[in-house]
Amino acid sequence: MSYADDIIIVGVGDNISLFYEEIVDVWSGYAWDEPIESELAGYPVNTIYTSDHGAGSYAGFIVTKEETIINNPSLVKNFIVASLKGWDYALENKEDAAKYAIERNPSLSYEHQLLAMGVLEDLTNYHGTRGCFNK
C-alpha cells in the first residue's frame, strides 16, 4: 500500500472555502496569493514550497523560441532588461506596485497585494540573482 492509495482528488475550482471548511486538506496555489488570502481571512496555513522539493514555479517565466534568440537577439535582450527593470521598480516600491495592481483590478485588496510583493521578492531572488537560475 502506498500513500497514493489514501489520496482522494476533489475538483474544487476556485472555491477556497472548501479548504477553510476542512472539506479538503490541501489547496494548491501561488505563494503570493492563496496563503496570504487565507491568513488575511483568519485561516493560518502551512505553505509547502515546490522549490523545497526540487521543483520551481513556472509563473513569471519569460519564454521565447530559439529562432527569436538567433534572429533578433537585441529584441530578446531589451525585453529581458525591461522586464527586470519593472521587477526592480516594483520590489523597491511595493506600495506603488500594490496600488497599480488595484488600479487595474479594483476587486484586489491593498493589504494582500502589499504582502504578495514581499513573497514575490523572495521568490524572484531564489537563486541569488533576480532573473537567473544559474550563473
Task: Say what each PLM segment does.
Residues 30, 50-52, 101:
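Active-site-proximal beta-strand/loop segments in catalytic clefts of secreted hydrolases
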